[in-house]
Amino acid sequence: LAAQDYGLTARTRWLEAPAGRARQQNAGARSAAGEAVWFLHADSRLPARSVAAALDFAGDEGLGYFRLRYLADGPMPARLNALGAGLRSRLLHLPFGDQGFLLRRVTFEALGRFDETLSGGEDHALVWLARARSVPLVDLSMPIFSSARRYRDEGWLRTTLRHAWLTVSQARRFSAMARQRSP
């Protein structure tokens, strides 16, 4: 997030954390001072209206997420993947981390933060746990733009098939984990 684009530079600072996305996101959450935590990927871009929606939602109950769109830095079919992410989010209630998770700190802590024992899919695991604990998943109905360069660099079909396989295999694993960790 280019915080200066939104007048947020006074509240933005750089920090270093050990390798691993879960560790890094948890370190960011620990260092944050607000009542809400907002997790964005480094290549995320948000229009001003999306930032406004996030600021309006911050502090509300639930796990908020945005509608994924891809930048024009990848192949045209990547737009189909963005449509698929929207369907997955709305129909299966499975938004992923590239959709910019926003939730109250107390909710994040109650969910146990991102699971640092996982080698990947920590965002997926958090969503399954939120669902198991009846935390509402809230579509903020605003776009978030991410790079499609992986589809360009690694091939659209190969990347799409790998993501589909990961989604299914992680869903089986994380849904069972979430049931075990829920009251």
Where are these regions (language model features)?
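Conserved donor NDP-sugar-binding/catalytic core segment of glycosyltransferases
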Residues: A48-P77
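Hydrophobic helical membrane-anchoring modules
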Residues: W128-P183
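Acidic donor-binding segment of Leloir-type glycosyltransferases
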Residues: L1-A19
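Acidic donor-binding loop at a coil-to-helix junction in glycosyltransferase catalytic cores
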Residues: G120-L126
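Conserved nucleotide-sugar donor-binding
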Residues: A33-G34, D98-L111
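The conserved acidic donor/metal-binding loop of glycosyltransferases
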Residues: H41-R45, R49
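Short aromatic/hydrophobic "clamp" motif used to bind/position activated sugar donors
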Residues: V37
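Glycine-rich, basic loop-to-helix element that forms the pyrophosphate-binding segment
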Residues: E16-A32
